[in-house]
């Protein structure tokens, strides 16, 4: 039993155990326990667990000290104490009632008023009542009065606490107390004592079948789920009162203009966050927009070709803009552009040959923007026109030859035009440009036929020509001959070759940089193939010889022609057995060897097969490699 004296200081004493059977009865303070019998042993049981090797500390409350198994006051007088019990799980000191001892206690205060507890024992059913009918006198310093004050404080704490603790009706008589719990007197009914919110009941002390507990408690009667269930039910009731998303949609203002229905809520009020894919299709669904209300002023996102008011970009396929018109023809145009973009993957470029001249610059730009949807996006793309006003006012740019040539020949390997190379323009070319020249007559040439590229497999054989090695690997990989020099060739319509030195082409490029307002700069075409160090600058020469429009080198194996009449003139290598003509001698040699001749110079080293072309041999060697021959 824990009692409090008038002294507020706590004096710590050494752990002294004395085996004196006689206890001195001298008044040393306000309350001194006096043993009324003389045949009681001064030693009491001390039950310690095997896992706990730390002895119970000794504290002095007022002039009384608490130790296991003896207590001494301030004068080191041994006083019989209550039995202490320490468990290994929580190392808490368990205080048993002194009523279980078969001793008689005398309590005296400073006024010599004695109240005697005459050999009373509490019953095992925890009723908190004595067997005898002795009259009990309580003092202010008794634990009963202190417990009353503590209970009043707990009532105040319950009022201001956020969650009121619930009485546990299954508390046992011998509750294990933590150091933060208040001690109760042996006369107090423990069932009526409410647990404090600052109680430190450890979970292992409340669990049933505690192997380290030696107090003989019936822990099976404990119920730890009452408070948790009540708290869970209260929290669930709060969550059920939460307004769902369906009810929240009823209070949203109805715009009245958008007839799109809301998505049905099929999940709970708190959807799972793991189901989100963060996809754009969940937030933007332009195919579900309302198309019936043409007078709707609400801006919607559409994908249309840009007109003359926006800056054209090379190789751009679609350009999302914001418009007000939601009529059906725009969406028909969108479907047409999508189908046109998809048809571009079939590599059928014959439809570009039938382009007619438009009546205005704006319509020509629209036609160019529509045809640009069939091209792929370039690796290095820059705006073609930087200044719209200079484009509209400049007489040189009034002829849309440069735009049509750059848009219609971006990715077409067999088209009639290449990207414009303004770096090789000179002043005479720009000044002599005539507006009366019809640029779209050039577009009426038929597409090139029978154009075959040299594959890298030609390099497998030593019989391949030097031109084939030059076309596939570049000049850097072979030794150039003295006659092979860096020159800039001018290929005109009359099939005459004019050799322009490199210094003159460089001078024309420097002169072009001095006139930035006459033309727009175009980024060079970035190709995946290895570029040759020979600079080829084929230019288009018109019949009236008014000007020349240079074309950027295409970095490909064949040179395209423009005029159908001069189509065969650029193919000087004609086959003697048929009507086909070729631009390069190795192409003619390959044609004769594979079609008209039985020559098979490429033989397989693993079998007896021979081939007329090295690429066929390399394809055949793959079958041997698959079978594990090498």
Swiss-Prot record:
A motif (9aaTAD) lies at residues 237-245. Pfam families: zf-C2H2 (PF00096). The modification Phosphoserine is found at residues 178, 263, 316, 319, 558. A zinc finger (C2H2-type) spans 573-596, 602-624. Positive transcriptional factor that acts as a component of the stress responsive system. Recognizes and binds to the stress response element (STRE) which is involved in the response to various forms of stress (heat, oxidative, osmotic, etc.). Involved in the regulation of the CTT1, DDR2, HSP12 genes. The 9aaTAD motif (residues 237 to 245) is a transactivation domain present in a large number of yeast and animal transcription factors. This is Zinc finger protein MSN4. The gene is MSN4.
């Amino acid at each position: 039993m824990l009692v409090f004296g008038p002294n507020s200081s706590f004096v710590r004493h050494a752990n002294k155990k004395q085996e004196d059977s006689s206890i001195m009865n001298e008044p040393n303070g306000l309350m001194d326990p006096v043993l009324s019998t003389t045949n009681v042993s001064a030693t009491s049981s001390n039950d310690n667990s095997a896992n706990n090797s730390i002895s119970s500390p000794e504290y002095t409350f007022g002039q009384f000290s608490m130790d296991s198994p003896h207590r001494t006051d301030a004068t080191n007088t041994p006083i019989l104490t209550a039995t202490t019990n320490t468990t290994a799980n929580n190392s808490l000191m368990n205080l048993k009632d002194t009523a279980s001892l078969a001793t008689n206690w005398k309590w005296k205060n400073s006024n010599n008023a004695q109240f005697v507890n005459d050999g009373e024992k509490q019953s095992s059913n925890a009723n908190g009542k004595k067997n005898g009918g002795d009259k009990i006198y309580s003092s202010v310093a008794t634990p009963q009065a202190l417990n009353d004050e503590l209970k009043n404080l707990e009532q105040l704490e319950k009022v201001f606490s956020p969650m009121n603790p619930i009485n546990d009706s299954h508390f046992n008589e011998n509750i294990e107390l933590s150091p933060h719990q208040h001690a109760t007197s042996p006369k107090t009914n423990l069932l009526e004592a409410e647990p404090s919110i600052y109680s430190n009941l450890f979970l292992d002390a409340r669990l049933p079948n505690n192997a380290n507990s030696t107090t003989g408690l019936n822990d099976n009667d404990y119920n730890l789920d009452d408070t948790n269930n009540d708290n869970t039910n209260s929290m669930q009731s709060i969550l059920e009162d939460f307004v769902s998303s369906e009810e929240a949609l009823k209070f949203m203002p109805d715009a009245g203009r958008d007839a799109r229905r809301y998505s049905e809520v099929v999940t709970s009020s708190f959807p799972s966050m793991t189901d989100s894919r963060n996809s754009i299709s969940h937030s933007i669904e332009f195919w579900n927009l309302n198309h019936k209300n043409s007078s709707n002023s609400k801006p919607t996102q559409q994908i249309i070709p840009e007109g003359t008011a926006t800056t054209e970009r090379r190789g751009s396929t679609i350009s999302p803009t914001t418009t007000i018109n939601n009529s059906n023809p725009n969406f028909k145009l969108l479907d047409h552009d999508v189908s046109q973009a998809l048809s571009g993957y079939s590599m059928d470029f014959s439809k570009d040959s039938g382009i007619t001249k438009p009546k205005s610059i704006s319509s020509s730009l629209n036609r160019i923007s529509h045809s640009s949807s069939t091209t792929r996006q370039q690796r290095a793309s820059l705006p073609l026109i930087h200044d719209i006003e200079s484009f509209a006012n400049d007489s040189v740019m009034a002829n849309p030859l440069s735009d049509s040539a750059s848009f219609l020949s971006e990715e077409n390997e067999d088209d009639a035009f290449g990207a414009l190379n303004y770096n090789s323009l000179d002043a005479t070319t720009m000044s002599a440009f005539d507006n009366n020249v019809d640029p779209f007559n050039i577009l009426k040439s038929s597409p090139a036929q029978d154009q075959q590229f040299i594959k890298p497999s030609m390099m497998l054989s030593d019989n391949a020509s030097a031109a084939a090695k030059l076309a596939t690997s570049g000049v850097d990989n072979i030794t150039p001959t003295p006659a092979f020099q860096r020159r800039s060739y001018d290929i005109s319509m009359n099939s005459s070759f004019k050799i322009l030195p490199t210094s003159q082409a460089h001078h024309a490029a420097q002169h072009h940089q001095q006139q930035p307002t006459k033309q727009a700069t175009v980024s060079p075409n970035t190709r995946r193939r290895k570029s040759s160090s020979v600079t080829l600058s084929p230019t288009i020469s018109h019949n009236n010889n008014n000007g020349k429009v240079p074309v950027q080198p295409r970095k490909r194996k064949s040179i395209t022609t423009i005029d159908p009449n001069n189509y065969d003139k650029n193919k000087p290598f004609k086959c003697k057995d048929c009507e086909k003509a070729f631009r390069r001698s190795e192409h003619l040699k390959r044609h004769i060897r594979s079609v008209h001749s039985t020559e098979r110079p490429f033989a397989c080293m693993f079998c007896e097969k021979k081939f007329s072309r090295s690429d066929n041999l390399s394809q055949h060697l793959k079958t041997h490699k698959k079978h594990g021959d090498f």
